[in-house]
Amino acid sequence: MKFIVKLFPEIMMKSKPVRMRFTKMLETNIRNVLRKVDEEARVQRQWDKIMVRVPEDKPEMIERYAERLACIPGIAHVLQVRESTFESVDDIYQQTLALYKEELAGKTFCVRVKRSGKHEFNSIEVERYVGGGLNQFTEAAGVRLKNPDMTVNLEIDNEHLYLVEKRIDGLGGFPMATQEDVLSLISGGFDSGVSSFQFIKRGSRTHYCFFNLGGDQHEIGVKQVAYHLWQKYGESHKVKFISVPFDPVVQEILEKIDNGQMGVILKRMMMRAASRIAEKMGIQALVTGEAMGQVSSQTLTNLNVIDRSTDMLILRPLIVMDKQDIINMSREIGTEDFAKSIPEYCGVISQKPTVKAVMGKILAEEEKFSEDLIDRVVEAAEVIDIRDIAVSMDTKITETETVDAVSGGEVVVDIRSPEEEEQSPLSLNGIEVKCIPFFKLATQFADLDKEKTYLLYCDRGVMSKLQALYLQEQGYHNVKVYRPA
């Protein structure tokens, strides 16, 4: 079984040297991602596509390959194909008939052929010959060139015939690391998750900067969002997660700053701190999830005042997006459930926020801050490799045990999202399994029998460890992490 990876059209429009560089990077990215699924993954770059071969003795890996390829930036679409050779146009027809005869029954169809190489026929001739044969010798409802029930796709590359079994839409965008790095200010909400994704999709290694205003519970939730985005869409490259303890800044704002100016000044302080962190990392741009007019600090006047707190470029990919569109996109990329479970901390500190900040007043208020305040919080920032999020959680989960087997009386809690649970249900003979999505666990765990012990399960063990830590901080000690052998 093979996959033919088609490049995003914008890549094909580049000059030859740039296209070559982008294609090489995409090949490397695909190899890096797939070899975490299967060390025997074979990836081969060609001029206008990339071939991925699934080992013949591992048919069970086909779906996993497809899932990962669909989430790698730079791919327009992926064709899951059956490869063979052919001797004539009639041979092409006979092979197509054998594969599609039953599937065409009762359906209208058309045949589409893409051809490269030297042949005695052209693509239209193959379409007519194969289409006519299928129409005559199958129980299809007939040929329909526009909006058919089914399209039979064939690709001919010199002597090779590729019968397309499935077309998988890709993520689009540019290959990871073909653009410069950015530092995304992430709060865990709808906006920051989507804005981070936009830059991952566009080919930038996206590092995460979190300003902790809500304690460990808030940080745990945000780490889940960042890890999800990286693991699903940016796993080909390592990135950093930076947690900045912003309590001292918030405390001084509450004690010293005029109520109406608090929101704008908080954002300015965040930009200053993030800029210094970015400079240390050699990053030239910040990314935020701000959208014009969404909240009081996001009027054009206030955004202008916020931008003038730093010389660094501030990018806002969501600036003219509607909130519902942002929520819809968060649903598509898998961050909606995280965002629903994370409270918004930034909006609670100012009761009467200004919508038209005056720079003179802002500067006067900022004179009240301690001189070394930003230096102190930046110095105290924790920088970790995002791959080590699970490890960092392990060091904190001192009272929570990880087990690979279930003992009598223990209950397994599947905390995966409903979609993941539906795709691969967890079934354990003779063992009670409860399905409680991670975003409902905090509220529903209190309703469970306190006399029982609960083993949290997810595919990779990261989410279960994060949730175990969260529950432990809430005072629940009848919880373990379940990692089956």
From Swiss-Prot:
It is an enzyme of class 2 (transferase). It is found in: Cytoplasm. Its EC number is 2.8.1.4. The active site is at 458 (cysteine persulfide intermediate). Residues 63-167 form the THUMP domain. InterPro entries: Rhodanese-like_dom, Rhodanese-like_dom_sf, Rossmann-like_a/b/a_fold, ThiI_AANH, ThiI_fer, ThiI_N, THII_Thiazole_biosynth_dom, THUMP_dom. Disulfide bonds join 346-458. ATP binds at residues 185-186, 267, 289, 298. Keywords: ATP-binding, Cytoplasm, Disulfide bond, Nucleotide-binding, Redox-active center, RNA-binding, Thiamine biosynthesis, Transferase, tRNA-binding. GO terms for biological process: thiamine biosynthetic process; thiamine diphosphate biosynthetic process; thiazole biosynthetic process; tRNA 4-thiouridine biosynthesis. GO terms for molecular function: ATP binding; CCA tRNA nucleotidyltransferase activity; tRNA binding; tRNA-uracil-4 sulfurtransferase activity. Residues 406-484 form the Rhodanese domain. The keyword ATP-binding applies. Pathway: Cofactor biosynthesis; thiamine diphosphate biosynthesis. Its main location: cytoplasm. One of its GO terms (cellular component) is cytosol. It catalyses: [ThiI sulfur-carrier protein]-S-sulfanyl-L-cysteine + a uridine in tRNA + 2 reduced [2Fe-2S]-[ferredoxin] + ATP + H(+) = [ThiI sulfur-carrier protein]-L-cysteine + a 4-thiouridine in tRNA + 2 oxidized [2Fe-2S]-[ferredoxin] + AMP + diphosphate; [ThiS sulfur-carrier protein]-C-terminal Gly-Gly-AMP + S-sulfanyl-L-cysteinyl-[cysteine desulfurase] + AH2 = [ThiS sulfur-carrier protein]-C-terminal-Gly-aminoethanethioate + L-cysteinyl-[cysteine desulfurase] + A + AMP + 2 H(+). Pfam families: Rhodanese, ThiI, ThiI_fer, THUMP. Belongs to the ThiI family. Catalyzes the ATP-dependent transfer of a sulfur to tRNA to produce 4-thiouridine in position 8 of tRNAs, which functions as a near-UV photosensor. Also catalyzes the transfer of sulfur to the sulfur carrier protein ThiS, forming ThiS-thiocarboxylate. This is a step in the synthesis of thiazole, in the thiamine biosynthesis pathway. The sulfur is donated as persulfide by IscS. This is tRNA sulfurtransferase. The gene is thiI.
